[in-house]
Amino acid sequence: MTLIKSISGIRGLIDSSLNIDLIVRYVQAFSNLSPLGKILLARDTRNSGSKYINHSIDLLNRTGRETINSDIIPTPTAQFVIIKNKYAGGIVFTASHNPSDWNGMKFINSNGTFLDHEQFKKLEEEFNNCPTISTTIDSDLIVEENDSLKSIDSHINNVLNLNIINKEMIKDRKHKVVVDCVNGATSVALPKLLENLGCDVIKINSDYNENFGRSPEPIPKNLSQLSAAVINNNADIGFATDPDGDRLSIVDNQGNPLGEETTLGLCVFYILKYFKEYRKHPIVTNLSTSLVSEQISKKFNTPFIRTAVGEINVVKRMEKEGSLLGGEGNGGVILKDSHLGRDSLVGAAIVLNLLAIETIKINELFDALPKYYIHKSSVALKPKNENFENKIKEYFIEDEINESDGLKIIRQNEWIHIRKSNTEPILRIISESESVARSKELVEIIKNEIK
């Protein structure tokens, strides 16, 4: 298995495509390109992350770089702390929703955001110029230990004091919430935030453990335990995250997974309905995000902008347009007033505030949202279909086509997005329409055209 490189960093199989020699070269390259100052190192609950942090500290100490070892914290916590404490940057060892035998590196610059295309290109060039470096974890490490709980508490305090969050209103509702943190990096942070908001918190898969307890991606088919726990405990809502905590999915009070696209839609609805000043600023999402958020934005006469897939693409456009709210349809909510990164803690607080102010149940809120249905599929990318763009453009010659990230065919109340995967030799095909059957039909049209 080769190393997977994408806009969000690198990923590979532990001690195979991702090994110590490769890691320390990337750490050295990142340090060489970073401004003076401290570099934060953090991880999710994969055991290998601890070893990777220790080797990174040894390398950075020997090159005169001060380090902060935050150990296990969510990726959004790392992003927030880097900005708050004015660090030179940070590296989080995580493979996000990949299985536990994978790990990876997410690189965060001094602005608390992931590297953009140009910055990642420079990192690759610097990496290629770095020699193989020997490290040890037996030396006396000069490291400023930053208790992970201190970082988590700082992040939670930021969320609790956001101008869009009414702590007392949420506390008055005394929500009963089940959380499934996939035994990952939010296992302390998310329950603690909810307890600070007066919630009765029931935890499943919420211990620091590389045995995730379920498939790590927080999509409906993986949330059966959470659904059962919500029903058995007569809870108001269930929250699920991925291992590094930048994605949030919801299960309603009847145990129904609402799909990761719903999270951003609910947050957009709450903020645009109750905070008119946000309507002056565009909502920014990627090309594959549901029409739900777009239709809500239209309802409140708010500009809506789409970018190429990838958190940093959304963030860069938010910065350019002066956007205050954005995200991706995978359960990633980005609120500028906290920090410019997807954040499950921010998403959870917003959804609970929406529940509190609307005084209805989450299934009723979901029923009130615009209804669209996404269907996702893929096909192997073979030489015979590498030129799929021309075939698709010819078939959809009468339709609007966006070519900024693959091909997106846009029609009234439906779309199809076809793009090459950054991580596998496949074409990803995503469609959305007003019915499940129609969305499947749209995907089949594409598959037939590129055979």
Cite the ranges covered by each PLM segment.
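Gly/Ser/Thr-enriched, mixed-charge loops and adjacent short helices
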Residues: 13, 103-233
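Short beta-strand-to-turn element immediately C-terminal to the catalytic PLP-Schiff-base lysine
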Residues: 15, 107-110, 249-253, 334-336
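N-terminal small/polar loop signature for handling phosphorylated ligands or for N-terminal nucleophile
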Residues: 28, 32, 39-103, 192-251
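Gly/Ser/Thr-rich active-site loops/lids in small-molecule metabolic enzymes
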Residues: 116, 203-205, 256-274, 311, ...
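Proline/glycine-rich low-complexity loops and linkers
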Residues: 121-157, 161, 253-329, 334
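Phosphate-binding and adjacent anionic-ligand microenvironments
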Residues: 237, 275-451
